[in-house]
Amino acid sequence: MPSVDTASAILRALSALGVTHVLYCPGSRSAPFAYALESGAFGGQARPVLDERSAGFLAVGLARAGALPAVIVTSGTAVAELAPAVLEASHARLPLLAVTADRPGELRGVGASQATDQSRLFATHARACIGLEAQEPSVALAGHVSRAVAAAVGAPTGAPGPVQINVEFRDPLTPAEADARGEEEQPVRATRVSVSAPTLLRWEEAVGEASAGLIIAGEGASTRARLWSQASGFPLLSEPASGAWAGGGVTPYEQSIVAGTLGRDVDTVVVTGRPTLSRPIHALLARPDVRVVVVDQHAPWTDISGNASTVVADLAPPTRPCGAVAAWAARVREACELAGRRIGDLLAAGSGRTMIDLARAVARASDGPLVLGASNPVRAFDLAVPSLEGRAVHSNRGQAGIDGTIATSVGVALGSASSRSADGGGRVTAVMGDLTLCHDASSLALAAATHSDLDIVLADDNGGGIFATLEHGAAASRDAYDRWFGLAQSVDYAALATAYGVSFARADTPEELSSILATSAPGPRMIHAPVERAAHLYGAIRDILR
């Protein structure tokens, strides 16, 4: 089968299997896909992207917004550029198809240009690696593509995640004469594989009676979390990007509540998703006197301390509230109200220009999906924002890296534009620090090229402020901290935005930021919002109920 025919058959199979977006990165070995895309072989949205690393994180953002993306790259280092996004997708359980063009086997290990062993480059981070040899017939090819898509979405029983389809192409890499004449293609029969629904275990069997229970939702939390809370009376505590906020019913200030005196009385915790932000939460889940029930459909489940009493795939809500939990829930509500007042007083006594003040301003002034930098911004929202109810919130906490945050935000904006009802509509607001933005500055080109409905709030604390909230802030001298952890950048952000065709605004106070966010703008916009480092606030808010 000619290479372009092979590429066309793969694209038609991907389209038939529900892949929504194809991101194509230019190259010679991957060129058959370009010709096939130009001929209309893919029925979804196809987009050329210059940078493979940006394309990978653009796919991560699309997956976070509910799309099923595929990234096509050429052979060699182009494949390795996808590695950071593949790691994030793997740990965040996001479906992503990495379609990697390759040279035929006889050209590997003999000194041929741009040839390496790339078929297992992603190792254990890919759910599967499907190898397609050159000239493979389309009937068998469609079956292999079906298996790849099934593995990516976690069907029938696995965890969703990235899958590599490594395609060997022989010359010629251009359309044959028959292809150029538009000869009719044979239909591709793709096999759809359904995801198996887990068995629901009775709440009474898994959790039992409790007098002081909590439900804690981390990234990838079950959509049933709110139902469990309503039916059991257990207060629902949630990280910003767990997905639980979209359904409402969340008790804010989770870190303050758990770290306070009330946290000592907790006897049962139901954990759903992967909570990673809070040391008080981790300490609670490690306590031997607390019964921990983990709800997770897939291995490996989240149990960092090894303290889980029970792990279940899914859980039915209880038929009645649990024990004496009503009085406990009232105590938690009172503690939450007290925490809110004290946090407000604490911030009112400060400068009003910290990352935490900025987070509260963004939460008030915007109403669409949020993308939060995985370092300081997501922690600021977790600590002190009183409500994110009804909001779709995303953060690359799979590996908690700062790489690709702009590209991820563009992906969320594109995916949200395709499904406004699912994500609540509205302009996407991304909040990130200066190092995070600088690390992915080239992805501003993606934002401009896609005309993304996106506000990028640059919370500029003059370097890596996150480390000051950790033990390194006390262990290092000021000069040593700035040299090895801060890494402040001298960047003209207005010029940077202009260079990439992104509009620019500056907000020197949270009030100015709120005003700008309330003003609509076409296309992407960068809002430079300088903030002061205030590491002391993080500990003070965490301990505000002690």
Kindly label every feature range from the protein language model.
Residues 46, 88-89, 95-99, 106-119, ...:
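Thiamine diphosphate
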Residues 100-148, 238-339, 447:
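Glycine-rich, acidic loop regions that bind phosphate or pyrophosphate groups
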Residues 9-19, 61-67, 149-159, 202-212, ...:
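Glycine-rich phosphate/diphosphate-binding loops that line cofactor/substrate pockets in enzymes
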Residues 120, 157-198, 516-546:
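Glycine/aspartate-rich loop-and-adjacent alpha/beta segment that forms the canonical ThDP
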Residues 7-11, 15, 28-37, 332-425:
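Active-site diphosphate/adenylate-binding microenvironment
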Residues 2-87:
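N-terminal cofactor/phosphate-binding cores enriched in small/glycine residues
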Residues 1, 282-376, 501, 507-515, ...:
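Phosphate/pyrophosphate-binding active-site segments
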Residues 64, 72-75, 80-81, 201-203, ...:
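Glycine-rich, anion-gripping cofactor-binding loops and their flanking helix/strand elements
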